[in-house]
Amino acid sequence: MTKPTLTYFPVRGRVQFPRCLLEYLGEEYNFNEVKTISDDLRKQLLFKQLPLYQEGDFKIVQTPAIIDYISEKHDFRGKTKEERARAHQCLAGIMEVLDHCLGYSFKMDKQQQEKFRNESPIKKFFEGFEMVLSQNKYLASGEKETYVDLMAFVMVDYVTNLGLMPSGDYPKLISLKKHYESSPQLKKYLESRPQSNF
């Protein structure tokens, strides 16, 4: 089997999601770190953006699409069409959280960060995820975890790292974060990943 390659910049960024997924699933992969997008690389990118996932001749961009492809390959998307739909619903919410945080975080001083936490546009997503996890063990509401539980961990990890955790109590999400942080599959990667806010 061809070992896949992920191409991205030397930061956590959006590639953190598929990297954590590959690490957790135990799939070996190559990481191609680039400082800039060269002209040759740009020609391979459908939307001229990274990350890029490549497996032999197959190439795909856009983080949600990469996550979906890897999860499908490992049967990690949910057992029923309802579970898969709920997982996709939550992933869309996670990507919205990421977009909100990355759109604001680099422009904020501490006072603005505090205001963001208290009036946070991401609060409604955290409340929604917390509600689902209060009623079900997993976000897709099935009997087993799916990729979206792991992606929720990456989201909470991101938001915490950026200092943008919304006000309120989210014990289920914090418990989820602790669970994956202590996972043997992820431990080595989490300790060696780029030390960047983004």
Curated annotation (Swiss-Prot):
Pfam families to which the protein is assigned, alphabetical: GST_C_3, GST_N
* Keyword Transferase attached: yes
Q: Which domain of life is it from?
A: Eukaryota
What's in the keyword line of the UniProt record? Transferase
GST C-terminal domain span: 80-198
Can you state which reaction this protein catalyses? Answer: RX + glutathione = an S-substituted glutathione + a halide anion + H(+)
Note the PANTHER family from the entry.
Answer: GLUTATHIONE S-TRANSFERASE
The family assignment reads: Belongs to the GST superfamily. Alpha family.
- Entry protein name: Putative glutathione S-transferase alpha-5
Q: Which organism is it from?
A: Dictyostelium discoideum
Gene name, please? gsta5
